[in-house]
């Protein structure tokens, strides 16, 4: 149960709490840091860095980089300087990758070199360094990833069908009576995770479990964003600032309070999952050999980190609704395929996937057309590497500009058009929404399976419309976004059952579905045991 809410408004207050005195110290640190950094760089750098726009002394390209939608500016620069480009952001060398070829050459073929993360002071302090998404590459990260993979292997995620079946049936039943699709998606995505991880279904959109966990994730996300802009950049560019006395760095105390709330929440959830009557992820990871030397708190973070990753599915489902409402002719083609393959007498099932190529294409094109993380998450090079005659130096921050990849006109002609047909014509088009290499999304297979069945059932069941498509599209083309993420703004859409027969079937299927997590997880466990026996 969520106990005590964190009392604060936004992470912006946290980063602004760096005092004027700390800023004075920062000036001295900047000059000293610059001196040693430049001396080290000139002595080691034998090859040139990749080309990029000229910056100013000390601050580099910081003033040229927009705070909102920087990926668009990066693409504009990459069109001029090439698919491997250097930016200097303060004292940080940042390498921007803007083509699938380059991203594959470096992030896939040399994955180990580029699987680390820049160590962000504020972000790590919020989790005590236990959040695997921010860990440096090494044994500790590999152990966390191993525990996560133990419940997210492709063959395992396919055995979670019983839970997806129940959750999507409830979703359809809810949308018969409300157009608040965002709340419905929020409940379903949270319930998928909470049931598997801790043995507790989320049955109502206003469940306090959702509000509490969402607040934690919001804080962490804002910390990550804040680390790359405004006052927060000082702490990241000059890490020595974190060692100043507490009266000069009040942000540290605030981070520590938030970290305590993370710790309590994750440990409480882990204990709930271990004590649940049915099989859960909590039980599975706790008994894994890799977990034996870990503390209870560290084990709890391996699952808690996955919750944040699961929340991206909410954004993706909202993108699906968006394109369904804005492009009714494409939605009609998807519905024609569903009617031909599935008919009206039953709901689409996971087993239908091989016969529904347009639905798969619909999902992939939606994610290409509106990437929810246009810059992905930053990586760090763990050693000097030569690539095409240029030096990618050790310690450089590496960003894959997913926006540039998805809007490459050579790869995706008419990139601003929503064209699922392109994926049907060429199923081998590069699809990189879930990242590259070892650091790609650990739950990609679970997410893809869940998104497919959710999309198929939504389009089978409903006609989805928006009252003002032109205004909605304009708003979404000019979003209020941050340094890395581009969340979908709120918009209205209506869900109308396609006919009375489908409406009756949805109501019947939900009425006879199991509602309690124990019965559902028993079915999941049977599937897993059956797979293991084979």
Curated annotation (Swiss-Prot):
Q: Is the keyword Transmembrane helix assigned to this protein? A: yes
Query: Which InterPro entries does the UniProt record give?
Result: Cyt_P450, Cyt_P450_CS, Cyt_P450_E_grp-I, Cyt_P450_sf, Cytochrome_P450_fung
Q: Does the keyword Nuclease apply?
A: no
- A GO cellular-component term linked to this record: membrane
Highest taxon listed in the record's lineage: Eukaryota
- Localization annotation: Membrane
Task: List ligand-binding residues for heme.
Answer: 441
User: By its UniProt entry, which Pfam families does this protein fall under?
Assistant: p450 (PF00067)
- Report the top EC class in one word: oxidoreductase
What is the role of the protein in this entry? Cytochrome P450 monooxygenase; part of the gene cluster that mediates the biosynthesis of echinulin family alkaloid. The pathway begins with the biosynthesis of the cyclic dipeptide cyclo-L-Trp-L-Ala (cyclo-TA) by the NRPS echPS via condensation of L-alanine and L-tryptophan. The prenyltransferase echPT1 then catalyzes the first prenylation step, a reverse prenylation reaction at C2, to yield preechinulin. Preechinulin is the substrate of the cytochrome P450 monooxygenase echP450 that catalyzes the formation of the double bond between C10 and C11 to produce neoechulin A.
**Protein name per UniProt:** Echilunin cytochrome P450 monooxygenase
Q: What organism does this protein naturally occur in?
A: Aspergillus ruber (strain CBS 135680)
Upper lineage:
Eukaryota, Fungi, Dikarya, Ascomycota, Pezizomycotina
């Amino acid at each position: 149960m969520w106990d005590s809410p964190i009392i604060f408004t936004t992470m912006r207050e946290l980063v602004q709490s760096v005092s004027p005195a700390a800023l004075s110290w920062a000036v001295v640190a900047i000059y000293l840091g610059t001196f040693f950094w430049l001396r080290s760089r000139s002595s080691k750098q034998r090859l040139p860095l990749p080309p990029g726009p000229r910056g100013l002394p000390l601050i580099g390209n910081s003033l040229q980089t927009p705070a909102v939608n920087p990926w668009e500016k990066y693409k504009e620069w990459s069109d001029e300087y090439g698919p491997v480009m250097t930016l200097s952001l303060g004292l940080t060398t940042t390498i921007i990758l803007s083509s699938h070829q380059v991203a594959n050459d470096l992030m896939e073929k040399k994955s180990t070199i580029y699987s680390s993360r820049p160590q962000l002071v504020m972000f790590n302090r919020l989790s005590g360094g236990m959040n695997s998404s921010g860990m440096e590459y090494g044994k500790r990260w590999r152990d966390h990833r191993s525990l996560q993979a133990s419940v997210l292997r492709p063959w395992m995620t396919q055995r979670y069908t019983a839970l997806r079946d129940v959750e999507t049936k409830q979703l359809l039943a809810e949308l018969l009576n409300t157009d608040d699709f965002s709340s419905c998606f929020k409940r379903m995505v949270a319930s998928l995770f909470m049931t598997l991880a801790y043995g507790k279904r989320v049955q109502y959109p206003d469940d306090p479990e959702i509000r509490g966990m969402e607040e934690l994730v919001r804080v962490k996300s804002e910390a990550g964003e804040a680390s790359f802009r405004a006052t927060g950049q000082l702490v990241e560019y000059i890490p020595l600032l974190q060692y100043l006395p507490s009266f000069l760095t009040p942000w540290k105390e605030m981070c520590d309070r938030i970290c305590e709330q993370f710790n309590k929440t994750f440990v409480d959830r882990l204990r709930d999952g271990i004590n649940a009557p049915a099989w859960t992820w909590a039980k599975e990871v706790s008994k894994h050999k890799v977990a034996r030397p870990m503390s209870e708190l560290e084990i709890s973070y391996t699952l808690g980190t996955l919750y944040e990753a699961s929340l991206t599915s909410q954004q993706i489902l909202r993108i699906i609704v968006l394109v369904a409402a804005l492009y009714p002719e494409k939605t009609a083609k998807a519905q024609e395929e569903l009617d031909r393959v599935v008919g009206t007498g039953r709901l689409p099932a996971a087993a239908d996937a091989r016969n529904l190529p347009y639905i798969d294409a619909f999902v992939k094109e939606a994610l290409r057309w509106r990437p929810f993380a246009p810059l992905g998450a930053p990586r760090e090079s763990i050693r000097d590497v030569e690539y095409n005659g240029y030096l990618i130096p050790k310690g450089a921050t590496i960003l894959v500009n997913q926006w540039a990849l998805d809007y490459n006109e050579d790869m995706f002609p008419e990139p601003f058009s929503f064209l699922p047909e392109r994926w049907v014509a060429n199923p081998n088009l590069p699809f990189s929404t879930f990242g590259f290499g070892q650091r790609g999304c650990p739950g990609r297979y679970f997410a893809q399976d869940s998104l497919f069945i959710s999309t198929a059932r939504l389009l089978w069941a409903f006609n989805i419309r928006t009252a003002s498509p032109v205004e909605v599209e304009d708003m979404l083309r000019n979003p209020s976004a941050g340094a890395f993420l581009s969340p979908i703004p709120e918009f209205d859409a209506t869900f109308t059952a396609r006919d009375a027969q489908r409406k009756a079937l949805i109501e019947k299927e939900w009425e006879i579905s199991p509602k309690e997590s124990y019965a559902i997880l028993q079915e999941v466990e049977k599937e897993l045991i059956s797979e293991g026996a084979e």
